[in-house]
Amino acid sequence: MTTRYIFVTGGVVSSLGKGIAAASLAAILEARGLNVTIMKLDPYINVDPGTMSPTQHGEVFVTEDGAETDLDLGHYERFIRTKMNRRNNFTTGRIYEEVLRKERRGDYLGATIQVIPHITNAIKERVIAGGEGHDVAIVEIGGTVGDIESLPFLESIRQLGAELGRDRTLFMHLTLVPFLGAAGEIKTKPTQHSVKELRSIGIAPDVLVCRGDRAVPANERAKISLFCNVEERAVISLKDVDSIYKIPALLRSQGLDELVIKRFNIDCKEADLSEWENVIYQEANPNGEVTIGMVGKYIELPDAYKSVNEALKHAGLKNRVTVNIKYIDSQTVEAKGDEVLQGLDGILVPGGFGERGVEGKILAAKFARENKLPYFGICLGMQVALIEFARNVAGMADAHSTEFNPASPFPVVGLITEWIDEDGQLELRHEESDLGGTMRLGAQLCHLKEGTKAAEAYKGNTCVERHRHRYEVNNNYVDRLEKAGLIFSGLSSDRKLVEMIELAEHPWFVAGQFHPEFTSTPRDGHPLFEGFIAASLSHQKRILG
């Protein structure tokens, strides 16, 4: 199979939405029957985003094979059916680590190691490997053209363009076309300068995607075409929209997919975007709304919970309601108590690390349990629910996780001390182990207990979900907690680890050690999120009478 490559770069400013644009183009090409994958090349020195602050970088998206990746890979999976893996995201740090390891082994036979050709060759090899087996591979380059960090990646794709030829490569550049209110007009000069910068390093863009708060008029697109030496039909206007799921149709209406197909000389069917039209219709025509309180510690940056936010929206589509998310700082719950939890239709406690704000999350779980309010706990959200139950129902007053209180007399949650790494080797871990790459990661089979809400949601006795954590329920306390009324509704593939808990005498109190948000999509939703929103809607109706 001959793979074609579309390289996506960004200019003028960051956060233009390269990932959304790349994913939307991929969705159109997939709708034309093509097998598409997407890669993200990140120019930072970190080996992966696993140890980066969520308030700086946003969430860490976990793939099926356990890679800790950029949040853009979440967008990719939500827009196309192809599942991402560790080949779909790599960083400058990963490349340098790989090259330096080879140098230490003597693989370069005494050569002087340089950015060109050794670093660029390593980048090119990964890009080619990531695209294998697909009709089209879209490669997003992180950062902004002009940044010093991006230069090795840009040089690598320049070389690939020359080596593979025009019939197998296409360069798509996103730029900002701002509207100046004082002047009352759109300005194209930033785009012209960005293209000039890109051309100065040897890359001539084939497509320009012009971002702005309004559509770019035909005369301005003609001007951009003239000064940037790009065909006028290849100057695409991408205005702000109220839903990212409208973007595939917006790009298709301007013929972007047709331009790509003709460039690559691919024979394929017309795009069928009916699934996306249905998503847009459901989003625009809700029958009600619910308010979900998300009690977390990274709420100053909503992207820290990007996949959770999207999964709640998807569940809203399936229940035909708008989901309003109220972000609640768990430290505020500690300071003010129940008053900040009033008026909610459901509470969701997402994952997180560290002691800050954990007591607020425990209070949120207690409030939901005592007030029969739908509760959904994810990862740490399950652990705090279990800790709360142990303290206030099972009679273990000082119960805690050893992550937060190693001296707790009732360590109901403890560190995973033995684990199998990605190479199948046994690893021993302790509190002083490295933070990066030392967690239980990736898709794992879970056995569901018959007659539980978990089994009802999944419509079966097993599920497969992705994990990202170091701590697990301490099996020494399972019997005591079970006798107190806690239901262990999900167990690991070997039935040795607790994966899900729930309460019997509660309308909907369900929590999982895994991250179901990573597999939710706008077209398919996710059974647990759908069940949670359905329960929240039912709670609202009961309250309103």
From Swiss-Prot:
Query: The organism sits in which domain of life?
Result: Bacteria
- Positions binding Mg(2+) in this chain are 72, 140
Q: Which organism is it from?
A: Shewanella denitrificans (strain OS217 / ATCC BAA-1090 / DSM 15013)
Any one GO MF annotation of this record: CTP synthase activity
Q: Where does ATP bind?
A: 15-20, 72, 239-241
Keywords linked to the UniProt accession: ATP-binding, Glutamine amidotransferase, Ligase, Magnesium, Metal-binding, Nucleotide-binding, Pyrimidine biosynthesis
Q: Which enzyme class?
A: ligase
Family classification: Belongs to the CTP synthase family.
Pathway assigned to this chain's UniProt record:
Pyrimidine metabolism; CTP biosynthesis via de novo pathway; CTP from UDP: step 2/2
Q: Under which name does UniProt file this protein?
A: CTP synthase
Question: Ranges for the Glutamine amidotransferase type-1 domain?
Answer: 291-542
Record has ATP-binding as a keyword = yes
Q: Which region ranges are annotated with the description Amidoligase domain? A: 1-266
Query: What residues sit in the active site?
Result: 379 (nucleophile), 515, 517
One GO BP on record is: pyrimidine nucleobase biosynthetic process
Positions annotated to bind UTP: 14, 187-192, 223
